[in-house]
């Protein structure tokens, strides 16, 4: 899915290897692939294990964090998905929180958030989704781009919020399952 997002945005995905112990990319595995053509770095916080972000941020590129598998994971005192330029979360059925389909975005960049809001609702300009603009002449808005509707419905959003409130319980169960796998597979020489 990460590669798809890059391709759909008109970019070229350049893959790098991962660390054998964490299954995450590292600054060392990313570095050989940085070039004058690099526009951003996308990292995946895999299986709840955060990517070491400081070395990745030191490249000076925008960093997109896929934090779908690390919704409640922290690096220091910062949650995964809140460290880079943009955090993205898939709510697919196999992710830590599911709404059936869909996802979420976090960013501190107001221009990027405005653009994300425009794109999620058929490319409607910012006045089309601001509550103040909806009170009068709500039918007047600009279409600034052509894009499919990507808004979650209320039922899906409610399911996601209910699961978010139970994230600690979910993580405890996942850790128990992880420990069972670790114990059962410990004797295998990989």
Each predicted region: which residue ranges?
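Active-site region of PLP-dependent enzymes
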Residues: 70-76, 83-190
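Short, well-ordered alpha-helical microsegments
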Residues: 1-3, 49-50
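Short beta->alpha connector loops at strand-helix junctions that form conserved
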Residues: 15-19
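Surface-exposed charge patches
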Residues: 4, 54, 183
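Hydrophobic/aromatic ligand-binding patch that stacks against planar heteroaromatic rings
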Residues: 4-6, 79, 155
